[in-house]
């Protein structure tokens, strides 16, 4: 390695070590390319997902679910002696999981021949990036580059982050004291997940949403199931509410705004602002390249994820679309194939999405509403979880499985699941859609009994008018 101001040369520079970046770097190395992976987080690679998002949040959600389940033990004949939370111990446990996975990813990079460079990258030209904060590498000259810098939380002017009282999703996963009253502004998937989690930990949660209902954009029948459960957990829902400002009063944060046009105040100990994310591209100095961005700052790419500068590619949150780690995984593999000389192209056909609330939500393909809006003629099959024996044995009968299929061909177009284990069930649906499966392909596949995946069989049969374990009158 060259030390000082002389640039290091590599075939491909990957900027950002999150899900898209490290997967792309490893696959490039597997395909014979010399790769340098630049990561600005001194703690290690993994990005928001591994360090401050997907992994730590699911660990804490798992802990909250275990705590919530304790409330139902007596119904099963199990007597408990009471449960309490040690938030510091919980953070140590969560941190251990993150550290283990991060070390594992770094080791995979090294074993595959990916060189990791810690520092912040910025473009000096379409062939060179400068590196700040690294004493060994000042710059990297590349033949191709991949931008995988992810996204950052959107900040509201009325509620600027201070990292202590008004926090983002990052800080919400690092709290060493469970807040007595937590206000969650924004009821998208991050807000819903965090709000549900803290409600189970014992916080009085107040959820604020500008739209007319929580989880805007999702099907109403899905949302109603989650609303019911949130109310059971004591969560207060303030829909149609817009926050204009805040003040501190008697040790509390008091938000002021309007709900459906009428003045309202909401008080709490902490405020989690979760109103979306924006591309993390401001420090890249893209003006030194031919890379173009759209009006929202997302990097423009074609079907090969190539930017308007033909030497530079971009993947993951920074290009927009569904901000999902598994989407970034696939984009990283596609770009690696393209750079290595393949003919791969990115196709957004079946990207599953999951909300780890209670009950879980998972969906893939088109929704029933989307199909109707597009004037498509479809078949719908819907089975409640209460029709599944396994759901009863788990004390989780809230929810349903819905399939959407083309009316004439029976080709599967979409699946929506709300219920226990939805995050695991959706993968079979994604595979079915990706392979162009028809309703009978699901219906005729023998599923073990009693299991939750039987819901997919029953829903497919319902769409065909042949459901066994659920009766609905034929229209």
Give the positions of each predicted feature.
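Glycine-rich flavin
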Residues: 2-10, 27-178, 211-215, 221-222, ...
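Beta1/beta-strand and adjacent pyrophosphate-binding region of the FAD-binding site
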Residues: 6-18, 178-185
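Short hydrophobic core segments
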Residues: 13-15, 121, 140-150, 185, ...
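Flexible, glycine-rich terminal cap/loop adjacent to redox cofactors
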Residues: 15-43, 48, 55, 59-66, ...
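Conserved phosphate-binding and hydrolysis motifs of nucleotide-dependent enzymes
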Residues: 16-21, 150, 186-191, 276, ...
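Short glycine/serine/threonine-rich phosphate/pyrophosphate-binding segments
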Residues: 20-24, 166, 191-194, 200, ...
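Glycine-rich dinucleotide-binding loop and its adjacent helix/turn
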Residues: 54, 149-204, 208, 233-237, ...
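FAD-site-proximal beta/loop scaffold in flavoenzymes
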Residues: 162-179, 265-339, 432
């Amino acid at each position: 390695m060259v030390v000082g101001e002389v640039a290091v040369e590599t075939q491909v520079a990957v900027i950002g070590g999150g899900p898209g970046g490290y997967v792309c770097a490893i696959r490039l190395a597997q395909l014979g390319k010399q790769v340098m992976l630049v990561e600005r987080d001194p703690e290690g690679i993994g990005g928001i997902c591994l360090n401050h998002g997907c992994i730590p949040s699911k660990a804490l959600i798992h802990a909250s679910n275990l705590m919530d389940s304790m409330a139902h033990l007596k119904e099963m004949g199990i007597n408990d002696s009471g449960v309490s939370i040690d938030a510091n111990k919980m953070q140590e446990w969560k941190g251990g999981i993150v550290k283990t996975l991060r070390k594992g990813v770094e080791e995979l990079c090294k074993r595959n021949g990916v060189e990791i460079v810690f520092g912040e990258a910025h473009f000096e030209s379409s062939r060179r990036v400068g590196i700040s904060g690294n004493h060994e590498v000042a710059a990297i000259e590349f033949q191709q580059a991949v931008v995988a810098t992810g996204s950052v939380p959107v900040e509201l002017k009325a509620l600027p982050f201070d990292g202590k009282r008004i926090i983002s999703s990052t800080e919400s996963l690092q709290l060493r004291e469970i807040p007595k009253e937590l206000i969650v502004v924004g009821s998208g998937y991050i807000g819903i997940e965090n709000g549900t989690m803290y409600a189970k930990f014992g916080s009085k949660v107040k959820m604020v949403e500008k739209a007319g209902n929580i989880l805007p954009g999702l099907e109403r029948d899905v949302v109603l199931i989650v609303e019911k459960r949130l109310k059971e957990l004591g969560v207060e829902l303030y829909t149609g509410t817009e926050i204009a400002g805040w003040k501190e009063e008697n040790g509390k944060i008091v938000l002021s705004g309007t709900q459906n046009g009428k003045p309202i105040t909401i008080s709490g100990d902490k405020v989690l602002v979760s109103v979306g994310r924006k591309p993390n591209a401001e420090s890249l100095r893209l003006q030194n390249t031919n890379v173009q961005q759209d009006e929202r700052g997302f990097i423009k790419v074609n079907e090969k994820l190539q930017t308007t500068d033909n030497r530079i590619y971009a993947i993951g949150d920074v290009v927009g679309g569904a901000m999902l780690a598994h989407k970034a995984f696939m984009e990283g593999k596609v770009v690696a194939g393209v750079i290595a000389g393949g003919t791969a192209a990115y196709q957004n056909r079946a990207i599953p999405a999951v909300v780890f609330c209670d009950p879980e939500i998972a969906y893939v393909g088109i929704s029933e509403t989307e199909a109707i809006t597009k004037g498509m003629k479809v078949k719908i099959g819907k089975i409640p979880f209460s029709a599944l024996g396994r759901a009863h044995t788990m004390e989780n009968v809230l929810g349903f499985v819905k399939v959407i299929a083309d009316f004439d061909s029976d080709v599967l177009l979409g699946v929506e699941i709300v219920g226990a284990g939805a995050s695991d069930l959706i993968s079979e649906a994604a595979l079915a859609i990706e392979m162009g499966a028809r309703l009978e392909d699901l219906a005729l596949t023998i599923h073990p009994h009693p299991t939750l995946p039987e819901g997919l069989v029953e829903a497919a049969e319902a769409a065909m008018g042949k459901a066994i374990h659920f009766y609905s009158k034929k229209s």
